[in-house]
Amino acid sequence: MTTQTVSGRRYFTKAWLMEQKSLIALLVLIAIVSTLSPNFFTINNLFNILQQTSVNAIMAVGMTLVILTSGIDLSVGSLLALTGAVAASIVGIEVNALVAVAAALALGAAIGAVTGVIVAKGRVQAFIATLVMMLLLRGVTMVYTNGSPVNTGFTENADLFGWFGIGRPLGVPTPVWIMGIVFLAAWYMLHHTRLGRYIYALGGNEAATRLSGINDNKIKIIAYSLCGLLASLAGIIEVARLSSAQPTAGTGYELDAIAAVVLGGTSLAGGKGRIVGTLIGALILGFLNNGLNLLGVSSYYQMIVKAVVILLAVLVDNKKQ
């Protein structure tokens, strides 16, 4: 038996269940872990999960924009490390924390734009272009930091910067507020602006998009620039939380971001996907990591479990396609 709305949309059909598979998986995961661990479903732990998820979730938003255009960005983890180190060094010399944040965001957006130019204007495959950028940015980070952590210090200015990572406005961690704002902004952009429509159109059919008069290169560059901007924002949050920037920070983060996008139902072929799905995908990874930790599962087995979950998500998506 199905339920039908005024608009005629049917619920609890096979098609509807396939659309909501990510949300259903998240709810099932929460139910299972809550049953196995009494410490899981508590306010403090939920805030802890959201705070830990925020970095990956914010990066995943940028990754979603790029993947929707039929691209991919493997450099976001290295970009996070570099921009985080730049922000930490600026704060460390007692320049205003807000200037450090602005500089890191501008650098991230600029590097993302350069990547976009290489992909769009240079006609280099996104995988190759971003792989090269990943190695380049990691090397630059090592040179910039001399392979050592960069501390923000213990001044009032450092405390202001730290607010972005450990502040709790109205009792809610600052990273959670930032994550919510980023997702709302991305949702509005994708569904209520011309840029959002162009991003979907470009991923759906690049040739047709170009023939319709849309500047496809410009859209790609904007998507990669936004991806870089959000990676740097994630880097700011991570450095603010730890009070230092590690030269190896962000290693493997690009894979977690891609996993969140895939778990959320966005097609790696581009043109299809929802930003809400990406949020759900990031939450699935966050709840899964936290639940396995509470259950005392070894980190080695955790990688296997995550791999199986992601593989199942891809198989389900392929079946849907």
Predicted regions and their residues:
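Transmembrane helix-bundle core of multi-pass membrane transporters
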Residues: A126-T193, I219-I222, R241-G250
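Membrane-helix/interface signature in polytopic inner-membrane proteins
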Residues: L184-S225
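Alpha-helical transmembrane segments within multi-pass membrane transporters and channels
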Residues: V95-M134, I280-G281
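Hydrophobic core segments of alpha-helical transmembrane domains in multi-pass membrane transport
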Residues: S22-T35, M63-T64, M134-V140, I178-M189, ...
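Single transmembrane alpha-helix segments in multi-pass membrane proteins
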Residues: A31-I93, V117-V124, G265-I275, V308, ...
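Transmembrane alpha-helical segments in multi-pass inner-membrane proteins
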Residues: S225, A231, R241-A307
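Cytosolic-side transmembrane-helix boundaries in multi-pass membrane proteins
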Residues: M1-A31, L184, G204, L211-K218, ...
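Membrane-interfacial amphipathic/re-entrant helices at transmembrane-helix boundaries
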Residues: M1-A60, E94-V99, V172, I214
